[in-house]
Amino acid sequence: MISFSRLRIGAKPSLVVACILLGLAACPALAGMAIEEVETSSGIKAWLVQDYSLPIVTTRFAFRGGRTQDPSGKEGIVNLITELLDEGAGNLDSDAFQERLDDAGAEMLFEAGPDAVYGNMRVLAERKDEAFQLLRLAIEQPRFDQQPVDRLRAQIVSSILARAKDPETAAQFAWMRAIYGDHPYSRREEGTVQTLAAVTTSDLKAVHERIFARGNLTIAVVGAIDPGTLKRDLDRIFGGLPAGPSLTPVVDAVPKLGRAIRVAYDLPQAQLSLAYPGIPRKDPQFFAANLMNQILGGGAFTSRLWNEVREKRGLAYGIYSTLENIDHASALVIGTGTRPDRAAETLSLIQAEVRRMSEEGVSEDELTAAKKKLIGGYAIENLNSSSAVAQTLVQIQLEDRGIEYVERRKQLIQAVTVEDVRAVAKRLLSADPTVMTVGPSLKGTNR
C-alpha cells in the first residue's frame, strides 16, 4: 500500500552505491547490534546503532499522519507532498536542489504510508553535513513551486489513467471499499483525477504544516556516527520544525466481514481473496496469531494451505495468508489464483482448512517449526542491511514496543503454547469471511 517516491541518485553517488552493496556482505555484524537512545537538548529523540564497517550514515524517520490526513475531496495530497519535497526547498528551486543533492552524493526519498510519512537518507559520513542541510530544507521549507507541482501532478494523473482499466487496480479498490467502507483506509493512495485537480499550493502548505512537527517524529540512525555528533545533527535537521502537529483524529476501522464480492474480468485466472478478523499488535494473543498464520498459509512451501491447494491438488501456483496490521485496523487475509473452472473447488478447500485450524488448532511439531521460522527469519527479513535495520527500528518505535523488542520478541514467541494457538485460531477463524472473486467465470463461488 505504500507508494515510493523517486529515488534520486546523481552524478557522484557511485561510492555510496558501492559501499551499500558491499555492506550487504557486512550485515552479519549487525546481528549483535547495540541500540541506544539519544536525546538532543531540544528534546528530539532517536535510536542509534553505531556501525563503522562502512563510512555510511543511514537516517530513517517518520511523521505520524499519512494518507489518512488527506482532506475530503483532496485525496492524494499527502502522496503528492512526498513527491514534491525534493523538488525545491528554501532558496533552492527544483534544479538547484537536485544539483546540490547530486553534488553531496546522497540518496533521499520520501513515501506516504496510510498512517505516517516516511523519509530516508543515505550518505557517506564525510558528506553528511551538506546532505543533512538539504534534508533540513526539504522537510522544513519545501517550496511547492507551481512548475514542479504541475509536472508531478500530471505524472500521477497519467499513472492513474493508465491503470484505470487494469483489473488488479479495480479489484484492489473494490476490496478496500468492501472491507473498510468509507474509512480513510479505503481511499485510493494517489487520489483521483478530480481530487488532485482540486489541490492548490495553499493546500499543500497547510497539510505539510499539520504533519511535519517535532512532536510527531520518530527517528532511527545506523552507521558511522557517534551519539554526540548525532545529537548536534538532529537539532540541525529537525530543530526548526514546529513543536506539535495538528492531526485529524482517525477512528478505528472494523473490517466488514461476511460479504461476497464478484468482479468480472476476462482473465486467464480467477483471483480469490478472503478476509477474516485480525488482531491488534498490542493484543496478548498477537504472537500466537502470528504462529497460527505461519502454519496456515504464511510459510512458503510448508504451510497447510500450500500443501492442500498446491502440492496435493495443483489448484494454484501459489497461495498465502497474512496478518495485516495498520494503526487503526487489522485483518487476516488469504489470497490465491486458480483456473476459473476450479475456483469453487479451491474456495471450498481453503475454507475447509480454515475450519480445521479453527476447530483443531495445531500440533507441537507444527508449532516448533513455526517458531524456528519466525525467530530465524526475522534477522534475514528485517536486519539484513543498515537500511533495513533503520526501517525496522522506526517501525518498532511507531508500534511503541520498546528498545529491547528485538531480543524480547524471541522470548514472546517461545512462550506460545499449542493451547494459545488453538484459542486464537478459534477466536479469529470462526467468523464468516468476506470473499472476493475476480475473473471471467464466477459461477459456483458462493460460500
UniProtKB/Swiss-Prot annotation:
InterPro entries: Metalloenz_LuxS/M16, MPP/UQCRC_Complex, Peptidase_M16_C. Gene3D superfamilies: Metalloenzyme, LuxS/M16 peptidase-like. Keywords: Plasmid. GO terms for molecular function: metal ion binding. Belongs to the peptidase M16 family. This is Uncharacterized zinc protease-like protein y4wB. The lineage of its organism: Bacteria, Pseudomonadati, Pseudomonadota, Alphaproteobacteria, Hyphomicrobiales.
